[in-house]
A protein has these predicted regions:
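Glycine-rich phosphate-binding loops of nucleotide-dependent enzymes
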Residues: 2-259
Length: 259
C-alpha cells in the first residue's frame, strides 16, 4: 500500500491497578478507510477509545499520529493532534440551535474580546455548508437540535469534528439506539466521509452487518487483546462471526446453549 497510516498503535497496554484492560493491542488506520473495531462488552474497545482520545494515559506501548510519536495525557492534546471522537451521547444541547451546537464554545466573534458580537450569519452559512458536504441538507440552521432525527444529530456531530480539524475520526457505536432508517442515514454519512479520502475512521460497533457494509479493515478484541484482524476482502462471514464470538466456533457455542 502506498498510503501511509494516519495512526499506528503498537503493543498498547493500559492497566488500572493490577487489572490489565488492554494487553499488547496493535493496529494501523489509513486515510480514506473505515477500520472497524469489534468486540463484545468488556473487550476493551471503550478503554482504547479513551486512551486514543486522551482521557486515559497509556501504561506502555507506542502511538504515532501522522508519523509522530504521541503520548496524550489530556483530551485537548488528542484534539490538537487531529483526533476527533464522537461519543454515543454526542455532546449536543437539544434546546439550542443546530448552529450553536455546531460551534459550541468556538463561536466566531467580531469585535474586542469579551465585548464582541457573534457572527451568526457566517456561522449559519458554515454550518449549512459543512452538513451538506456529508449528506444532510438542513432547511433552517436555527432549528433546535431536538427537532432533528437521531441520524441527523450524528451527522451534525461528525461534521463538527471534521470542520474543527479531525483527521482521525473515532465513532463510538454511532448506530446504536437508532431505528433502521436512521442507521442507514448514519452509514451513508460515514461512507461520504470515507470518500473524502483524507480522513481515517475508526468505527466501534457491535453490529457485524454494519461493519460488513462499510469497513475496509477489521480488528477484533476480546478481553483486552487482539484476537484477529484483516481486510474485509480477506475475511468471510463465518470468520467475522467466529471472531465476534471471541474466537469461538459457532458450532461450539450452539452446543453450549444446548447444555
Amino acid at each position: 500500500m502506498d498510503k501511509k497510516p494516519l495512526i499506528e498503535i503498537k503493543n498498547l497496554v493500559k492497566k488500572f491497578g493490577t487489572f490489565t484492560a488492554l494487553n499488547g493491542v496493535s493496529l494501523v488506520v489509513y486515510p480514506g478507510e473505515v477500520h472497524a473495531l469489534l468486540g463484545d462488552n468488556g473487550a476493551g474497545t471503550s478503554t482504547l477509545i479513551k486512551v486514543l482520545s486522551g482521557v486515559h494515559p497509556m501504561t506502555s506501548g507506542e502511538i504515532k499520529v501522522d508519523g509522530e510519536i504521541v503520548n496524550f495525557t489530556t483530551p485537548r492534546q488528542a484534539s490538537d493532534a487531529g483526533i476527533g471522537t464522537v461519543y454515543q451521547d454526542l455532546a449536543l444541547n437539544a434546546l439550542t440551535s443546530v448552529t450553536r451546537n455546531f460551534f459550541l464554545g468556538r463561536e466566531l466573534i467580531k469585535g474586542p474580546s469579551g465585548f464582541g458580537l457573534m457572527q451568526m450569519d457566517e456561522m449559519d452559512r458554515i454550518t449549512t455548508e459543512e452538513m451538506s458536504k456529508i449528506g444532510i441538507n438542513i432547511a433552517n440552521p436555527n432549528q433546535p437540535v431536538g427537532t432533528m432525527s437521531g441520524g441527523q444529530r450524528q451527522t451534525l456531530a461528525i461534521a463538527r469534528a471534521i470542520y474543527f480539524g479531525a483527521k482521525i475520526l473515532i465513532l463510538d457505536e454511532p448506530t446504536s439506539a437508532l431505528g433502521q432508517k436512521q442507521q442507514m442515514e448514519v452509514l451513508k454519512t460515514i461512507k461520504k466521509v470515507q470518500r473524502l479520502g483524507n480522513i481515517a475512521i475508526i468505527l466501534i460497533t457491535h453490529n457485524e452487518i454494519h461493519a460488513r457494509l462499510i469497513a475496509d479493515r477489521y480488528t477484533f478484541l476480546s478481553l483486552g487483546e487482539v484476537i484477529g484482524s484483516g481486510l474485509s476482502s480477506e475475511l468471510g462471514n463465518e470468520d467475522v462471526k467466529r471472531l465476534m464470538a471471541g474466537g469461538a466456533k459457532i458450532g461450539d457455542l450452539a452446543k453450549e446453549l444446548e447444555q
